[in-house]
Amino acid sequence: MNQSTTIERGKAAGASPFHAGELAVQRRAGVAEHADAAGRIGIRGFMPEQHRAFFAQLPWFIVGGVDADGQPWATLRAGEPGFVASPDPVTLRVAGGALRDDPLADAWRPGAPFGGLGIELPTRRRNRVNGTVAGLDGAVLSVAVTQSFGNCPKYIQRRTPEPVAPAWPAVPLRRASALDEADRMLIARADTFFVASANLDPDAHRARGVDVSHRGGLPGFVRVDDARTLTVPDYNGNRYFNTLGNFVSNPRAGLLFVDFERGDLLYVAASAEIVWDGPDLAAFEGAQRLVRFRLSEVRRSEAALPFRWSAAEYAPQFARAGAAG
């Protein structure tokens, strides 16, 4: 029996990998038994070799964290493949890659929670890794892994990146308390966004920390209700409910919208409310529930992403679901 098998069996027989908020959502959705069985096997305390190799081949990496005020943010880092690496199964190293205007630029210190998502748009592969910052060495961030698990390829739009030189001179960061017309248009045509959430309750044990996840749909799946309110459908996923479970414990959320054509990054701080039923559900085909985000801050960093992407090839699930999350 190898070390990985020993770890897996010990974990499966031990405590649940989920915290109270995740368990509450699983029970309400009627999937608690399924999630418990799947989570005990699928959520590891180490990265398998396949994930370690996958992260090392990526030119970008989605990151979630919290700032000094406890606000979660979803952001990203970019670099030559290999800038994210893993010297051993329980350590992830991110060597630089921070972009200008990164809302988490000053957030990293030993013990800080870290959520990571490796996503490869051309192949629709994605894997998650969570942990805490173990150390800083200049621009290198070292993360001690507490949770590692894969996600299925559903709802990911296929795109191919092309590197570009950074825009110069850089346009100053725009900060506001509400969306302007350009922001609303970006969100209205978005087919992808990323969301960071957090549960920092010590009682959450190894489920404590930050999650950052992907959401995808056809353009218009994020409804702009007004300049400070967004409504998003929640569709069938892995049934772990990491993000929604965090919202039960802590409604603060950080959203990241990427303009794949221009390279703009739109960072949104918000408070999340889960809408379990009601007439609004009918407006979103196939939605099992909704999430309503009430915005408190908006930051737009123009042409910050050092890639431009090909037109989207939409995920095959949309032929059945219309939109998805």
Feature annotation, model-predicted:
Residues 1-325:
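Binding-site signature for planar aromatic cofactors or substrates
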